[in-house]
């Protein structure tokens, strides 16, 4: 197992959170401003960290613990967030936000579930 796969009880450099800061499930918007929109729907929450494009809050939704961490734009910054959050205990990640599509059968507002990426 490489160092990047080892569980850690230390605060992670980029996302600036440790194991006590996040829930098992984490929503991942790109824009840090979307953290406010997401947490407004929750029962309650606490801001846990903000560093560069990464902003994290943890709370509950219908009595279920949940976290949100913004990732910034693009796959590299998202990969950093997922790897560091996994190191401190997050197990489930759901990317939320907007995207574009070149398929003519897709309309604005369609739910898109990615099955793979290149």
Each language-model region and where it sits:
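Metabolite-binding pocket within alpha/beta catalytic cores that recognizes anionic/polar moieties
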Residues: 2-118
């Amino acid at each position: 197992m490489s160092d990047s796969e080892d569980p850690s009880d230390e605060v992670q450099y980029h996302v600036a959170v440790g194991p006590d800061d996040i829930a098992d499930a984490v929503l991942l918007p790109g824009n840090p401003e979307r953290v406010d929109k997401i947490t407004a729907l929750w029962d309650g929450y606490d801001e846990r960290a903000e560093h560069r494009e990464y902003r994290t809050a943890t709370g509950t939704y219908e009595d279920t613990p949940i976290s949100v961490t913004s990732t910034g734009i693009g796959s590299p910054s998202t990969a950093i967030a997922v790897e560091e959050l996994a190191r401190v205990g997050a197990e489930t990640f759901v990317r939320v936000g907007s995207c574009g599509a070149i398929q003519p059968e897709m309309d604005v507002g369609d739910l898109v579930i990615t099955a793979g990426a290149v």
